[in-house]
Amino acid sequence: MAGHSQFANIKHRKGAQDAKRAQKFTKLIREIIVAAKQGLPDPEFNSRLRSAIIAAKKENLPKDRIDAAIKSATGNTQTDNYEEVVYEGYGPGNIALMIQTLTNNRNRTAAELRHALSKYNGKLGESGSVSFLFNHVGVIAYKASSIDSFDSLFNTAIELHALDVEEIIQDDTQEKIYYVICNVQDFGNVRDQLFHKFSDAEFSRLFWKASDTVKIEDEEIQKKISNLMDLLENNDDVQYIDSNFTFY
Protein backbone atom coordinates (compact mmCIF):
# COMPACT_ATOMS: atom_id res chain seq x y z
CA MET A 1 0.00 0.00 0.00
CA ALA A 2 1.65 3.22 -1.15
CA GLY A 3 1.08 6.76 0.03
CA HIS A 4 1.50 9.06 3.00
CA SER A 5 0.85 7.66 6.44
CA GLN A 6 1.80 8.15 10.07
CA PHE A 7 4.86 5.98 9.35
CA ALA A 8 6.27 8.81 7.22
CA ASN A 9 7.40 10.61 10.37
CA ILE A 10 8.26 7.62 12.54
CA LYS A 11 11.42 8.09 14.60
CA HIS A 12 13.33 4.80 14.63
CA ARG A 13 15.68 5.91 17.34
CA LYS A 14 13.83 8.58 19.23
CA GLY A 15 15.23 12.09 19.17
CA ALA A 16 15.85 14.82 16.64
CA GLN A 17 19.07 14.95 14.67
CA ASP A 18 20.39 17.72 16.88
CA ALA A 19 19.87 15.73 20.11
CA LYS A 20 22.91 15.45 22.30
CA ARG A 21 25.14 12.51 21.40
CA ALA A 22 25.42 11.45 25.04
CA GLN A 23 21.65 11.25 25.36
CA LYS A 24 21.35 9.17 22.20
CA PHE A 25 24.02 6.83 23.49
CA THR A 26 22.19 6.45 26.81
CA LYS A 27 19.03 5.30 25.06
CA LEU A 28 20.87 2.97 22.73
CA ILE A 29 22.76 1.37 25.61
CA ARG A 30 19.55 0.81 27.57
CA GLU A 31 17.96 -0.96 24.62
CA ILE A 32 21.04 -3.18 24.24
CA ILE A 33 20.96 -4.08 27.94
CA VAL A 34 17.25 -4.93 27.92
CA ALA A 35 17.54 -6.90 24.69
CA ALA A 36 20.50 -8.89 26.02
CA LYS A 37 18.67 -9.65 29.27
CA GLN A 38 15.60 -10.95 27.43
CA GLY A 39 17.50 -13.58 25.46
CA LEU A 40 20.97 -14.88 24.82
CA PRO A 41 23.65 -12.15 24.93
CA ASP A 42 24.60 -13.08 21.37
CA PRO A 43 23.10 -11.15 18.43
CA GLU A 44 23.34 -14.26 16.25
CA PHE A 45 20.64 -15.89 18.39
CA ASN A 46 18.82 -12.79 19.66
CA SER A 47 17.07 -10.75 16.96
CA ARG A 48 16.17 -7.89 19.28
CA LEU A 49 19.77 -7.56 20.39
CA ARG A 50 20.91 -7.69 16.77
CA SER A 51 18.54 -4.85 15.89
CA ALA A 52 19.70 -2.84 18.90
CA ILE A 53 23.34 -3.23 17.88
CA ILE A 54 22.54 -2.22 14.30
CA ALA A 55 20.82 0.94 15.58
CA ALA A 56 23.78 1.68 17.86
CA LYS A 57 26.30 1.31 15.05
CA LYS A 58 24.29 3.68 12.85
CA GLU A 59 24.64 6.30 15.58
CA ASN A 60 28.39 5.54 15.86
CA LEU A 61 28.23 4.15 19.37
CA PRO A 62 31.77 2.82 19.99
CA LYS A 63 32.18 -0.96 19.88
CA ASP A 64 33.68 -1.08 23.36
CA ARG A 65 30.54 0.56 24.77
CA ILE A 66 28.32 -1.89 22.89
CA ASP A 67 30.34 -4.79 24.30
CA ALA A 68 30.23 -3.28 27.79
CA ALA A 69 26.44 -2.92 27.60
CA ILE A 70 26.04 -6.57 26.62
CA LYS A 71 28.38 -7.63 29.42
CA SER A 72 26.51 -5.54 31.99
CA ALA A 73 23.28 -7.32 31.03
CA THR A 74 24.67 -10.52 32.56
CA GLY A 75 25.25 -8.72 35.86
CA ASN A 76 22.65 -7.99 38.49
CA THR A 77 23.06 -4.30 39.25
CA GLN A 78 19.95 -2.34 40.19
CA THR A 79 20.92 0.59 37.95
CA ASP A 80 20.84 -1.66 34.88
CA ASN A 81 17.58 -3.32 35.91
CA TYR A 82 15.38 -1.54 33.36
CA GLU A 83 11.81 -2.48 32.63
CA GLU A 84 9.63 -1.58 29.68
CA VAL A 85 6.71 0.59 30.71
CA VAL A 86 4.19 2.22 28.38
CA TYR A 87 2.52 5.40 29.61
CA GLU A 88 -0.67 6.77 28.07
CA GLY A 89 -1.59 10.42 27.89
CA TYR A 90 -3.24 13.31 26.12
CA GLY A 91 -1.57 16.41 24.72
CA PRO A 92 -2.61 19.77 23.22
CA GLY A 93 -5.59 19.52 20.87
CA ASN A 94 -6.62 16.35 22.72
CA ILE A 95 -4.07 14.28 20.80
CA ALA A 96 -3.40 10.78 22.14
CA LEU A 97 0.11 9.67 23.08
CA MET A 98 1.62 6.26 23.76
CA ILE A 99 4.97 6.82 25.45
CA GLN A 100 7.30 3.81 25.51
CA THR A 101 9.99 3.91 28.17
CA LEU A 102 12.86 1.90 29.61
CA THR A 103 13.08 2.84 33.27
CA ASN A 104 14.56 1.65 36.54
CA ASN A 105 12.17 3.83 38.55
CA ARG A 106 8.50 3.87 37.53
CA ASN A 107 7.52 6.57 40.01
CA ARG A 108 10.23 8.96 38.82
CA THR A 109 9.35 8.46 35.18
CA ALA A 110 5.62 8.88 35.77
CA ALA A 111 6.19 12.09 37.72
CA GLU A 112 8.43 13.55 35.01
CA LEU A 113 6.00 12.67 32.22
CA ARG A 114 3.05 14.03 34.20
CA HIS A 115 4.91 17.32 34.68
CA ALA A 116 5.82 17.57 30.98
CA LEU A 117 2.28 16.87 29.81
CA SER A 118 0.67 19.29 32.27
CA LYS A 119 3.02 22.06 31.11
CA TYR A 120 1.28 21.97 27.72
CA ASN A 121 -2.29 21.40 28.94
CA GLY A 122 -2.03 17.64 28.63
CA LYS A 123 -2.40 14.90 31.18
CA LEU A 124 -1.10 11.46 32.01
CA GLY A 125 -3.87 8.88 31.77
CA GLU A 126 -4.60 5.55 33.37
CA SER A 127 -3.84 2.27 31.64
CA GLY A 128 -6.36 1.80 28.83
CA SER A 129 -7.36 5.46 28.65
CA VAL A 130 -5.62 5.95 25.29
CA SER A 131 -4.48 2.56 24.00
CA PHE A 132 -7.94 1.72 22.63
CA LEU A 133 -7.29 4.35 19.94
CA PHE A 134 -4.31 2.35 18.64
CA ASN A 135 -3.39 -1.04 17.26
CA HIS A 136 -0.23 -2.57 18.72
CA VAL A 137 1.82 -3.95 15.82
CA GLY A 138 5.34 -4.86 14.83
CA VAL A 139 7.13 -2.77 12.20
CA ILE A 140 10.19 -3.83 10.21
CA ALA A 141 11.50 -1.18 7.80
CA TYR A 142 13.75 -1.55 4.77
CA LYS A 143 15.13 1.09 2.46
CA ALA A 144 13.78 0.50 -1.04
CA SER A 145 17.34 0.74 -2.32
CA SER A 146 18.32 -2.32 -0.24
CA ILE A 147 15.58 -4.58 -1.66
CA ASP A 148 15.43 -6.11 -5.14
CA SER A 149 11.78 -5.17 -5.54
CA PHE A 150 8.68 -4.24 -3.57
CA ASP A 151 6.93 -7.38 -4.84
CA SER A 152 9.70 -9.60 -3.50
CA LEU A 153 9.42 -8.12 -0.01
CA PHE A 154 5.61 -8.00 -0.12
CA ASN A 155 5.22 -11.63 -1.18
CA THR A 156 7.68 -12.85 1.45
CA ALA A 157 6.01 -10.76 4.16
CA ILE A 158 2.54 -12.06 3.32
CA GLU A 159 3.83 -15.64 3.34
CA LEU A 160 5.03 -14.92 6.88
CA HIS A 161 1.51 -13.73 7.78
CA ALA A 162 2.39 -10.05 7.91
CA LEU A 163 -0.64 -7.74 7.85
CA ASP A 164 0.58 -5.34 5.17
CA VAL A 165 3.56 -3.64 3.57
CA GLU A 166 3.46 0.14 3.17
CA GLU A 167 5.59 2.05 0.69
CA ILE A 168 6.30 5.50 2.11
CA ILE A 169 8.40 8.51 1.16
CA GLN A 170 10.11 9.88 4.28
CA ASP A 171 9.26 13.55 4.80
CA ASP A 172 12.73 14.55 5.95
CA THR A 173 14.91 12.68 3.45
CA GLN A 174 12.50 11.97 0.57
CA GLU A 175 13.80 8.42 0.69
CA LYS A 176 11.48 5.52 -0.12
CA ILE A 177 11.01 3.10 2.77
CA TYR A 178 9.07 -0.17 2.91
CA TYR A 179 7.31 -0.83 6.22
CA VAL A 180 6.34 -4.43 6.95
CA ILE A 181 3.51 -4.48 9.49
CA CYS A 182 2.71 -7.61 11.49
CA ASN A 183 0.95 -8.79 14.61
CA VAL A 184 2.92 -8.42 17.83
CA GLN A 185 2.97 -12.19 18.39
CA ASP A 186 4.51 -12.71 14.94
CA PHE A 187 7.04 -9.88 15.22
CA GLY A 188 10.08 -11.91 16.26
CA ASN A 189 9.59 -14.58 13.62
CA VAL A 190 8.84 -12.12 10.81
CA ARG A 191 11.89 -10.04 11.71
CA ASP A 192 14.13 -13.13 11.82
CA GLN A 193 12.88 -14.56 8.53
CA LEU A 194 13.19 -11.22 6.72
CA PHE A 195 16.72 -10.86 8.08
CA HIS A 196 17.72 -14.25 6.67
CA LYS A 197 16.34 -13.37 3.24
CA PHE A 198 17.03 -9.63 2.96
CA SER A 199 19.71 -9.04 5.63
CA ASP A 200 19.49 -6.26 8.22
CA ALA A 201 16.43 -4.02 8.32
CA GLU A 202 16.82 -0.26 8.54
CA PHE A 203 15.08 -0.58 11.90
CA SER A 204 12.43 -2.65 13.64
CA ARG A 205 10.30 -2.17 16.71
CA LEU A 206 6.87 -2.54 18.25
CA PHE A 207 4.68 0.39 17.29
CA TRP A 208 1.35 1.82 18.44
CA LYS A 209 -0.43 2.55 15.14
CA ALA A 210 -3.37 4.93 15.46
CA SER A 211 -6.70 3.60 14.19
CA ASP A 212 -7.54 7.12 12.99
CA THR A 213 -5.45 10.29 12.84
CA VAL A 214 -6.38 13.75 14.07
CA LYS A 215 -5.37 16.59 11.76
CA ILE A 216 -4.10 19.61 13.71
CA GLU A 217 -4.36 22.81 11.66
CA ASP A 218 -4.20 25.47 14.37
CA GLU A 219 -0.63 26.86 14.34
CA GLU A 220 -0.62 27.64 18.05
CA ILE A 221 -1.61 24.09 18.94
CA GLN A 222 0.96 22.76 16.45
CA LYS A 223 3.65 24.75 18.24
CA LYS A 224 2.57 23.43 21.64
CA ILE A 225 2.60 19.86 20.36
CA SER A 226 6.08 20.29 18.88
CA ASN A 227 7.38 21.76 22.14
CA LEU A 228 5.80 18.94 24.14
CA MET A 229 7.31 16.29 21.87
CA ASP A 230 10.74 17.89 22.25
CA LEU A 231 10.37 17.94 26.03
CA LEU A 232 9.28 14.31 26.18
CA GLU A 233 12.05 13.24 23.83
CA ASN A 234 14.62 14.92 26.05
CA ASN A 235 13.69 12.55 28.88
CA ASP A 236 16.34 9.83 29.17
CA ASP A 237 13.72 7.20 30.04
CA VAL A 238 11.64 7.78 26.91
CA GLN A 239 12.50 5.55 23.97
CA TYR A 240 9.60 6.13 21.57
CA ILE A 241 6.49 8.27 21.33
CA ASP A 242 3.62 7.14 19.12
CA SER A 243 0.64 9.40 18.53
CA ASN A 244 -2.50 9.92 16.48
CA PHE A 245 -1.91 13.44 15.15
CA THR A 246 -0.76 14.85 11.84
CA PHE A 247 -0.02 18.41 10.73
CA TYR A 248 -0.62 17.60 7.05
Curated annotation (Swiss-Prot):
GO terms for biological process: regulation of DNA-templated transcription. Residues 1-21 are annotated as: Disordered. One of its GO terms (molecular function) is DNA binding. InterPro entries: Integrase-like_N, TACO1_YebC-like_2nd/3rd_dom, TACO1_YebC_N, Transcrip_reg_TACO1-like, Transcrip_reg_TACO1-like_dom3, YebC-like. It is found in: Cytoplasm. Its main location: cytoplasm. Keywords: Cytoplasm, DNA-binding, Transcription, Transcription regulation. One of its GO terms (cellular component) is cytoplasm. Belongs to the TACO1 family. This is Probable transcriptional regulatory protein ECH_0704. It comes from Ehrlichia chaffeensis (strain ATCC CRL-10679 / Arkansas).
